[in-house]
From Swiss-Prot:
This is Prolactin-5A1. It comes from the Eukaryota. Residues 80-99 are annotated as: Disordered. Residues 1-30 form the signal peptide. GO terms for cellular component: extracellular region. Disulfide bonds join C88-C207. Its main location: secreted. It is found in: Secreted. Residues 80-97 have a biased composition (Polar residues). Keywords: Disulfide bond, Glycoprotein, Hormone, Secreted, Signal. It holds the Pfam family Hormone_1. Belongs to the somatotropin/prolactin family. Gene3D superfamilies: 1.20.1250.10.
Length: 230
């Protein structure tokens, strides 16, 4: 779905007011439709996508660092890397496994898929802290990075929800709110044996890194589809 491109309104003051309000609002559903129709919609979407793209890149990079840090600390001989990982809890037929498939999806569908993927990592910090607190070595370094990742996931989710709310102003049939399932911790971290537990954590960080790459790709695709040539 592409929004029709409209020439920007001459009143820069109105747009600046809209942007400043956007930063304070928990929900942008109160943005007046008339503002959406004068070109401000495209500008606000572009503004949010700029922030979201930067966060998603950081999320992707930090997830990769966390996986590498964990393997360096707890799998120095790379035994885990030579084994198939556990099936990722976000694996689903509805989630495209490459960029080409994602590009063929309708933007509103891909947007929902991306939000669902992020929601599936909602309890990441809780599970990591509970399962790494008693490990030898320096788990606090990894936990500190997971705390940053947790904040990035929350920011990404909020931004994508705001984008969805704005799009619902243009397309009233688009659902504004949906229930997105959280993650129970299975299958990675509910293990008692240390070696199995470590492999489960390796699989967790592997899946997180894989999803972070997908989220970054999906956001890039959504930006090109929804605010092209901005």
């Amino acid at each position: 779905m592409r929004l029709s491109k409209i020439q920007p309104h001459q009143s820069g003051t109105l747009l600046l007011l809209l942007l400043s309000n956007l930063l304070m609002w928990e929900n942008v559903a109160s943005v007046p439709r008339c503002i959406m129709e004068d070109g401000g919609c495209q500008k606000v979407l572009n503004y949010i996508f700029n922030m979201t793209s930067t966060i998603s890149e950081n999320f992707n990079n930090l997830s990769s660092e966390t996986l590498n840090d964990f393997d360096t600390e707890y799998d120095p001989h790379q035994k885990f890397q030579n084994r198939p990982t556990m099936t990722c809890h976000t694996s689903s037929r509805s989630v495209p496994n490459n960029k080409r498939k994602a590009e063929r999806m309708r933007p509103v569908v891909l947007l929902n898929v991306t939000i669902r993927m992020l929601a599936a990592w909602k309890n990441l910090l809780h599970h990591v802290e509970n399962n790494m607190a008693d490990l030898d070595g320096t788990p606090y370094v990894i936990i500190s990075k997971v705390k940053l990742i947790d904040r990035q996931i929350k920011k990404l989710t909020k931004n994508l929800q705001n984008i969805k709310t704005i799009l619902s102003q243009v397309n009233p049939d688009l659902k504004k709110n949906e229930d997105y399932p959280a993650w129970s911790g299975e299958p990675y971290v509910q293990q008692s044996k240390r070696r199995v537990q470590l492999f489960g954590l390796h699989s967790l960080f592997f899946c997180l890194n894989n999803d972070a790459q997908k989220v970054s790709d999906f956001i890039s695709i959504l930006r090109d589809q929804i605010v092209p040539n901005q």
